């Protein structure tokens, strides 16, 4: 991942942890979701076609970008979640 994307996503680590490991998200502003969606598309070359008013679409986006983020930043995870992520 590009450094500026990692830096932006760092502020949303908690949201990505809850999405990836607990399958829920809290309310995230639409402008933030749009930027996270842009980052996902930039990093993967794929579009999730996210509807920002659809809770399952938002969860899918946060899980997808979270998995990308944690692959490169596994050290930011608590130890018990590191094992879960490595074994997933």
Predicted region positions:
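Acidic metal-coordinating catalytic centers involved in nucleic-acid phosphodiester chemistry
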Residues: 1, 11, 29, 37, ...
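Acidic, low-complexity, intrinsically disordered interaction modules
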Residues: 19-76
């Amino acid at each position: 991942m590009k450094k500026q994307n990692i830096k932006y996503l760092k502020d949303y680590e908690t949201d990505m942890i809850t999405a990836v490991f607990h399958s829920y998200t809290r309310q995230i502003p639409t402008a933030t979701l749009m930027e996270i969606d842009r980052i996902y598309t930039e990093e993967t070359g794929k579009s999730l076609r996210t509807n920002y008013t659809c809770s399952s679409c938002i969860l899918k986006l946060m899980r997808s970008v979270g998995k990308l983020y944690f692959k490169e930043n596994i050290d930011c995870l608590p130890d018990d979640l590191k094992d879960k992520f490595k074994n997933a």
